[in-house]
């Protein structure tokens, strides 16, 4: 197959060498990430049901999850959730196949509850959240189920990817994963709702961290502020392992500490959605786990989209995979790679309208020796785009 693949040199300063760089990551417990995680869990559960009962993944898009914040009264020693967070599941799913009815509501609600239970230990799923499935209904004829014709793009859209991650991007990503990972053994009172904003100016990296604390572990304001100081030191120690640049860390900068009044970031569940913070699918991290205003990005929401033909999901992940593979295989001659893949509705997903690769090279490099290699690599990855489908279903690929 002759695919439309463009490979060109990009003459600009690589992102890590620019004077200023801004990078953000919303942690797994941020309301936008909660919406993404639930949407993807629902899609996985529906996909598994369809595969088990009909041998293929049927049409669905569950990328319209809304998190509507509840009300809580946190306090030192332990507070209360006063009103549960409302979580709306919407989108579309195949709910009838021939004469068979798919139990889509029970599948989707169970998937959402299981996701919350498995990821947020301080959340009482039965009491602290209310889940409502309003997923739209659709049906297919049994003949359609077993139609194995070519898979075609269901939208005209584009995906974007880049590589490699800069030092600042890596630090932001690893900081959140550290705080929501191994740090929990040292400081279990640090909740899951964490946001990290990285700002590099020349050779100084600033990390501003918003971290919800769980109130039941903390007896008073003095202990809270002592724990916050410990957290700052741990974040700094973790970050300096990744860079020789100066790193400055700021934690919960809206806190107030005065003799007459102290205000800290306290929660009952470790999640700000308990107290009025809302979230939506696609409003947070891109598929590489970051928000990168100094890079090209797609605004497409990948979480919850069907993993078979929705190019908004497939092409964003594939573009990042291609970019990373180019950097890995072509070596130190490559400073930066930008990949864009454009679909056309009705066109085979392995034959996009165009796959564009722009390369920033290091120094005086013979571009010709890389151009054909890159073209062949892109051609191969496009030919195998459908390999991503089961990786999504099995949870091997994250999209936020």
UniProtKB/Swiss-Prot annotation:
GO terms for molecular function: ATP binding; magnesium ion binding; methionine adenosyltransferase activity. GO terms for biological process: one-carbon metabolic process; S-adenosylmethionine biosynthetic process. Catalyzes the formation of S-adenosylmethionine from methionine and ATP. Pathway: Amino-acid biosynthesis; S-adenosyl-L-methionine biosynthesis; S-adenosyl-L-methionine from L-methionine: step 1/1. The keyword Protein transport does not apply. It comes from the Archaea. It catalyses: L-methionine + ATP + H2O = S-adenosyl-L-methionine + phosphate + diphosphate. It comes from Thermoplasma volcanium (strain ATCC 51530 / DSM 4299 / JCM 9571 / NBRC 15438 / GSS1). Its cofactor is Mg(2+). Keywords: ATP-binding, Magnesium, Nucleotide-binding, One-carbon metabolism, Transferase. ATP binds at residues 136-141. It is an enzyme of class 2 (transferase). PANTHER family: S-ADENOSYLMETHIONINE SYNTHASE (PTHR36697:SF1). HAMAP family: S_AdoMet_synth2 (MF_00136). This is S-adenosylmethionine synthase.
